[in-house]
Amino acid sequence: MLLAGVMFAGAATAQPKTSDKAMWKSARKMAKTLADEGWKIDGSRSMEEMLYNHYQKLNDENNQELIANVIGNTSVKTMNQGQQWAQINAATTYAKQAKMMVVGRITNETGAGIEGAPSVDSFYEGYESQVVTEIKGELKKSFSLYREKENGGIDYKAFYLLNEASASQARIRAMERAMLESEFARANAARISEFVRNGFSIENEE
């Protein structure tokens, strides 16, 4: 089984600078919580070190965190399967939120009466589907965890970073493709482009 090649590292790591002590403390606390839940690091570095490095990157205001879980009935047999499903889950989660953000802005702009119009619904569905495709290449995996199950499978959790500048370009590409199938979107291209360009805060599921 692939898990045989995965280690939980316990090697000592360099203590961070004094100014980063709060971040290091948070990383250690989160690492303990995750370890208590049975999670192990997929890699040779310690969980607290990977969390600390992850938190440092989140200090960049252009980066957001996206956490993907492959757990429960969707657990997998290998790490490669976990990685593939996690990326799909992350992209799907982001695309749903991107669509709902546009739905809300269009509804506020045009009124609720526009909802349900075939051309509008076609654009929403097409936009969500295209965002899934476009955003996959922009997701940068920070690190991942696994948890062995009694049935021989594993739960998998991946932590991604998403840069808003790259995400915005991905949303624009998705919008342009979705507009090809929507008369409503083509007629309102300028306003919809403005909505799509505006970023939003990602909501991660527990």
Label every PLM stretch briefly.
Residues 14-206:
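Domain-level marker for long, solvent-exposed, non-transmembrane regions
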